[in-house]
UniProtKB/Swiss-Prot annotation:
Single GO biological process annotation from the record: killing of cells of another organism
Protein name: Kalata-B3/B6
Residues in the signal sequence: 1-22
Natural source organism: Oldenlandia affinis
Disulfide bonds: 71-85, 75-87, 80-93, 126-140, 130-142, 135-148
Pfam families: Cyclotide
Amino acid sequence: MAKFTKSLVLCLLLAAFVGAFGAELSEADKANVVNEIAANIQREILKGVKSSETTLTMFLKEMQLKGLPTCGETCFGGTCNTPGCSCSSWPICTRNGLPKRAGVKSSETTLTMFLKEMQLKGLPTCGETCFGGTCNTPGCTCDPWPICTRDGLPSAAA
């Protein structure tokens, strides 16, 4: 958010500069300045999106390694290539046993970091992951999996 604010202030300062000295600039120069401002703002926004994608990818990869029931592959010929996975709920490979507890704290930290970042960006997350296709938080659904999301817009109390 701080980067966006800085970009906005920079944009306003450049716009004020162009407005103040606009009479001395040609139309081509004005267009170049405006295009440069737009490109800078777009770059800042895309940096934030890339950060969110990286955090989500890291979270999902860690969850797969720490014991979420899916193995990250589909059944092929009735078998799964990932060790510890089986094709019992075709077409998705699932783990044979309960998740190991060794990495739970690390996974919770990653989940908390991901959810905090998403909430700061305004996504309606509920603060839990889907378990058995359901969410325990009232008003939340398991769509899109694996993050529970609110059915509608978040209420002011949430």
